[in-house]
């Protein structure tokens, strides 16, 4: 287990894409600025998806261009196809996530194609990214379970991961899209991924649908994950997956990691302030517990 881990806050993208209240560009940028001020360095700032399907992301270009001027952050974006890639690169994006679902039904819902067809459609993007100097991450949705098909064969997931690695991505992320995983699943998958793909970063994207998000994050850290996604306040959900609730709360995750002796570089007080502000903007409570209970120590407790 490393004493350091990369955290990526997905609140400005995954955290708001399902919200009924349409946030203004100014509000999205204020969220990103607050996260940066709290010490978040990797931030997923937008998705270049069709505004028809994800209207919350209609201002992706404006938000990205402004976010890219904030010092000290890595502004990451999500794209689903070559049109999204074109828009992202034209806006100046250099860190792009691609996503494919491990199951046929989920990928049909998300991309209107089977997983193999989506991977084939990504081939021109892989080639262009090398020429454009763009760093790619391959994200595999429903890696641990699917709301339509149930259990997912890990071999199927790792075959998709192998295709991403062969195409030259810098990172592979395994997503528990609807919170179906339990800690032993997480550990087994990530240990295999670490052994099979030593040349790339291994990331995990967790949802807390069944209240196992932090337990799964703990398992991921113990298994050697390099990158953990989370969302300030625990906001989020997938518009194409029924009953998908929020991401694991970044607030609670940072509290856990710091208590484990893992340095995050995040100012927890500022992050909690941001979470409370975010609740006001969204006009409903968020599931993070730390903003409600507060930290129980002023510095990380001794582990001995």
Task: Label the model's feature ranges.
Residues 1-304:
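Catalytic cores and adjacent flexible loops of soluble metabolic enzymes
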């Amino acid at each position: 287990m490393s004493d350091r881990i990369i955290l990526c806050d997905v609140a400005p993208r995954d955290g708001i894409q399902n919200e009924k209240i349409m946030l203004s560009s100014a509000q999205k940028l204020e969220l990103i600025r607050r996260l940066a001020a709290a010490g978040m360095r990797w931030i997923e700032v937008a998705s270049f998806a069709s505004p028809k399907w994800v209207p919350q992301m209609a201002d992706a270009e404006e938000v990205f261009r402004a976010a890219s001027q904030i010092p000290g952050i890595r502004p990451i974006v999500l794209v689903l196809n070559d049109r999204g890639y074109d828009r992202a690169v034209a806006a100046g994006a250099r860190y792009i996530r691609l996503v494919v679902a491990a199951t046929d039904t989920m990928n049909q819902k998300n991309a209107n194609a089977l997983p193999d067809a989506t991977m084939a459609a990504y081939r021109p993007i892989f080639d262009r990214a090398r020429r454009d100097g763009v760093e790619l991450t391959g994200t595999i949705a429903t890696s641990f379970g699917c709301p339509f098909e149930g259990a997912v064969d890990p071999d199927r997931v790792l075959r998709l991961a192998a295709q991403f690695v062969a195409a030259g991505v810098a990172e592979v992320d395994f997503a528990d899209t609807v919170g179906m995983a339990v800690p032993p699943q997480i550990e087994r998958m990530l240990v295999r991924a670490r052994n099979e793909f030593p040349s790339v970063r291994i990331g995990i994207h967790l949802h807390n649908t069944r209240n196992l998000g932090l337990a799964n994050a703990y398992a991921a850290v113990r298994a050697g994950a390099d990158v953990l996604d989370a969302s300030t306040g625990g906001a989020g959900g997938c518009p194409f997956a029924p009953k998908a609730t929020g991401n694991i709360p970044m607030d609670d995750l940072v509290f856990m990691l710091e208590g484990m002796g893992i340095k995050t570089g995040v100012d927890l007080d500022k992050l909690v302030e941001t979470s409370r502000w975010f609740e006001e903007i969204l006009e409903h409570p968020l599931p993070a517990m730390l903003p409600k209970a507060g930290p129980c120590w002023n510095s990380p407790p001794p582990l001995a």
